[in-house]
Amino acid sequence: MKKYDVQKFELLSNEQIADGIFEKPPWKDGRGAEIAMMLGISLTTLIFGGVTSASMATFGKIQNEIGKRVGLHPYRRANLLDGFANAIVLVMPFLSVFVFIGTSLTEGYDMAEPLTVTQVGGSMFYSMMLFLVLLFSVVTGWGRQYEGENGEPLNRK
């Protein structure tokens, strides 16, 4: 059995992860940072099987660091974190724990056939529409505000 030296594994800090993201030009402005934030929280939520509390606790500090670097207002950062974590990734029928729980609760009734994971996932309209609205706001800049010197929201940086 192989033994691993734990000291050889170095964990990356939030700042180091943000540095890695900001090395590429597309992520250096408000829109690019928001797209990076969207992809990051969505991937993290997928990894956690739709458990948003764990994904937001894991990726939240990284997202906060990304948003700070481009000056996005904290409300915008928080709304994007919560919104994208609870959007389309929750209805992925092959990963979301909520879809599996929903289908298992429909089994065992003689009066109706049990629902499949695609039926439950496909009926979660709120999550799908939330994703589209947030994606529209990221791409167009709708609602994007930056943080002023005293923390006040500014429409332009």
Placement of each model-derived feature along the sequence:
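Core transmembrane alpha-helical segments of multi-pass membrane transporters/permeases
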Residues: 1-16, 38, 42-43, 47
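Cytoplasmic juxtamembrane regions at transmembrane-helix boundaries
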Residues: 8-32, 155-157
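Generic structural signal for well-ordered, non-membrane alpha-helical segments
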Residues: 11-15, 32, 52, 56-59, ...
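Re-entrant/interfacial helical elements at transmembrane boundaries that shape
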Residues: 16-20, 52-67, 94-110
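Hydrophobic alpha-helical transmembrane segments of multi-pass integral membrane proteins
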Residues: 24-62, 69
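Alpha-helical transmembrane segments of multi-pass membrane proteins
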Residues: 31-45, 70-91, 114-115, 121
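Juxtamembrane and boundary regions of transmembrane helices in multi-pass small-molecule transporters
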Residues: 88-157
